[in-house]
Design a protein with these regions (language model features):
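Catalytic activation segment of kinase domains across protein kinase-like and atypical kinase folds
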Residues: 202, 425-488
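Conserved structural core of kinase catalytic domains
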Residues: 363-420
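Short alpha-helix
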Residues: 207-231
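ATP-binding glycine-rich loop module of kinase domains
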Residues: 313-350
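Conserved class I S-adenosyl-L-methionine
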Residues: 172-195
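N-terminal auxiliary segments of SAM/dcSAM-dependent transferases
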Residues: 1-32
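Conserved SAM-binding loop of SAM-dependent methyltransferases across substrates and taxa
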Residues: 79-90
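A short glycine-rich, Lys/Arg-flanked "PGG" loop and its adjoining helix->strand segment in the class I
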Residues: 152-170
Length: 554
């Protein structure tokens, strides 16, 4: 049973009453017997309800290799969004939360944990004699100075909490970047509520918090006495990460295919960050404009987590949620986020073996300790190559799709029977070759192109008795979606006609929507997904309004 200690709590800590939204979150936690709120967040559209209760918060560190048997101090537990994750990975967790009501609901949310102790109160008032392997300071440092720009305040705080670390212990910090790309694009500042408020060093009254540039945060960490640190760049931000890069692994190619930004309020946007990442990467500027920073800090030890990149699919649930990590030793590992994902992990291994037996090139994988392990390969993906070649040589672009389609046809034996569960199945249509097993991830983003050969990887999903043309449809659909000017060089209509997809495209769109909506849990996350949509016309209007305002001032 989780223990809650309140003797160090001072009533003035709760001078700010909980909002109605926070009171509702407390009620939701009290009524829920398990830490699973998918149904609830599908029904309640409020942002803070989603943020405090979604499992997606765990993506910040569910890929991180905590040392076995370790102890962790969480400072600022909030409503316990990350507390359960820490309990899963560490032998003992102590969570400190300044609000008594929040502390009570951390206890309620994780009441069945046997390795969790919760303190209500300010960390400076609590005489915890224990020292820890890890201290987690997630989204709290910005508030320590109550909006002050004085770096000494933040350095002193980091130095004081560092006294609770064991020798060789690690402080883990997650903060906003003042120069984050979404804020450069016009998103409201998180602590002022006004676009560009901290970027232009405005004279607005102090905000509720203060965010940092990378150099500013580096100086604060160094002045606190931490001699060693490692920066990670969670994208789109630290609250709901999908990709986590590091200083030792900066993207070299487009992020559009794997990253979906979101906005709490998109009404003030002047640009869309996903449109800018290609230029950011080409100009080596990601470390300056990443929306958030995640930092490991140590006073005297450089033995940091050996993960240099992580891609997480926490949104896909317990059976299909994975962390794919690149390690400093040159290995790539694919790890199920929950034990329920082990069967799917074995399926992926089987898929690779079957494709290899069909004389196709695949990245060789081994199943070790409930992980898939494979070598890191520095080749370009076919997707990246297609983006280049369509502009230089459209004929080669077409030939590459011929090559891909031939590989799809080669991947499995053929059957005469179409799967009747195919969404929108119409027996009057000619679907072409039906594969006994259709490996639907045989698309350019999951394929390397090297020495004129296709080398497939991460072949996760298989559909039995599906059309080969459906796999090709997926390859074309996403290629044209992510190469926005592809139509200038060769039209999608021409490609559809070449492969006999004209009469099938609409039916395949129905099947694809059905697959993606189930895979990405649209029903559960539809309120969040609304925040990923942007109004491009609205951005143009915003830009024109700025121009008109400038002319009036002249």
């Amino acid at each position: 049973m989780t223990l809650l200690i309140t003797q160090y709590y001072k009533s003035e800590n709760d001078e700010v009453e909980l909002s109605q939204e926070e009171m509702d979150i407390c009620s939701y936690i009290s009524q829920n017997n398990e830490d699973n709120y998918d149904q609830l967040i599908s029904e309640d559209p409020r942002w803070n309800v989603f943020l405090q209760l979604t499992r997606l918060r765990k993506s910040l560190l569910n890929w991180y290799d905590f040392k076995p048997g370790s102890t962790l101090l969480e400072i600022g537990g909030g409503f316990g969004a990350l507390t359960g994750l820490f309990c899963d990975h560490c032998a003992e967790v102590v969570s400190v939360e300044g609000s008594l009501q929040r502390a009570k609901h951390i206890q309620e949310r994780h009441k069945n944990r046997t390795n969790l102790k919760i303190y209500a109160g300010n960390i400076g008032d609590i005489p915890i004699d224990q020292k820890f392997d890890y201290i987690a300071l997630i989204g709290l440092l910005e508030f320590e100075g109550k909006g002050s720009k004085d770096r000494l305040i933040y350095s002193d705080f980091l130095k004081s909490i560092g006294e609770r670390l064991k020798p060789g212990g690690k402080l883990i910090i997650a903060v906003e970047n003042r120069f984050g790309l979404k804020y450069l694009c016009g998103a409201p500042d998180p602590y002022y509520g006004i676009p560009f408020a901290q970027i232009n060093q405005s004279s607005y009254k102090k905000g509720t918090g203060h965010s940092f540039s990378k150099q500013e945060l580096t100086t604060i960490i160094e002045n606190a006495g931490y001699k060693h640190f490692k920066f990670y760049y969670p994208l789109p931000d630290y609250r709901l990460p999908q990709l986590i890069y590091s200083e030792k692994c900066i993207p070299k190619t487009s992020l559009k295919e794997r990253l979906t930004p979101y906005y709490i309020d998109s009404s003030s946007l002047l640009a869309y960050e996903n449109d800018l990442y290609d230029d950011v990467i080409e100009n080596n500027a990601l470390e300056f404009v990443a929306n958030s920073f995640l930092v490991e800090c140590s006073f005297n030890d450089m033995d940091f987590c050996d993960v240099i990149y992580a891609a997480v699919s926490t949104d896909r649930g317990r059976r299909e949620g994975f962390a794919t990590t690149i390690h400093s030793d040159g290995n790539v590992k694919k790890t199920p986020l929950y034990s329920e994902g082990l069967p799917q992990l074995r399926n992926i291994k089987e898929n690779h073996d079957e494709l290899e037996s069909s004389q196709l090139k695949v990245i060789r994988t081994l199943l070790k300790e409930n992980r898939l392990v494979m070598p890191y390969v520095a080749y370009d993906t076919l997707s990246d190559y297609l983006k280049i070649i369509i502009r230089k040589n459209p004929e080669e672009f077409v030939l590459l799709f011929d090559q891909l389609y031939n590989s799809i046809l080669q991947s499995s034996s053929i059957t005469e029977h179409m799967n009747p569960s195919f969404h929108g199945y119409n027996d009057s249509l000619d679907y072409g070759v039906i594969l006994e097993k259709a490996y639907i991830d045989m698309i350019p983003v999951n394929c390397f192109y090297h020495d004129k050969e296709l080398i497939f990887f991460d072949q996760e999903f298989v559909k039995e008795q599906y059309p080969a043309k459906y796999v090709l449809f997926r390859a074309l659909k996403y290629t044209y979606f992510f190469i926005q000017d592809a139509e200038r060089y060769i039209s999608l209509g021409d490609m559809q006609e070449r492969y006999g997809l004209n009469h099938l495209w609409e039916e395949f769109e129905k099947e694809e929507y059905n697959f993606v909506s189930l895979n990405r849990k649209y029903n559960e996350y539809h309120n969040f997904l609304k925040r990923t949509y942007i109004d491009r016309n609205g951005m143009r209007v915003n830009a024109k309004q700025l121009l008109r305002a400038n002319r009036k001032n002249d």
